[in-house]
Amino acid sequence: MAAPRELVNKYHRERVDLLMYESTGIWKCFEIKNTVSDFRSSAKHSFWGDYGYYILNADIYSKVKDEIPDDIGVWLVYKPENSKGWMECVKRPKKRKRLCSHESLMFALMQAMSREYKKYRKNLEKENKTKKNKIKKR
């Protein structure tokens, strides 16, 4: 189960790009970085769970490889032209101390799922409205 989420600690809000919960009780946090400047920006790299990963393309990885902490893993995204693409884990993370409770992470995941469902419903309603308008014009 995974969804984008926002976590709040007593000082500020942070958005984790992707949060995954495994049935074994393990939380994995993923930060997606699309450019080297995005990787190096002052925006937080939020690794709240037991394991943290960056999701990068090979070009970015080659430029920031030495800046990645030892305990953070890396997934590389490959997307050749005319292909669905794939991902490969090129660096395994080390287990870290979780920065917030299981309950807080679960609540954040549930909130994110609710937000994503609402977005899905809104888009579906837009599509249905567009289809109805096309039918009326015939």
Regions found by a protein language model. Give the residues of each.
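Generic preference for well-ordered secondary structure
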Residues: 14-16, 36, 58, 93
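Catalytic cores of nucleic-acid endonucleases
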Residues: 27, 31-79
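A short acidic/basic microdomain associated with nuclease active sites
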Residues: 1-11
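Extended interaction regions within the primary functional domain
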Residues: 6, 40-44, 94-99
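Residues in well-ordered beta-strands of folded domains
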Residues: 3-4, 19, 75
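Acidic/polar N-terminal loop/beta-strand segments that form early-domain functional surfaces
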Residues: 5-6, 21, 32-35
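Active-site beta-strand-loop-beta-strand hairpin of nuclease catalytic cores
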Residues: 11-29
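Non-catalytic C-terminal interaction segments of nucleic acid-processing enzymes
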Residues: 10, 65-138
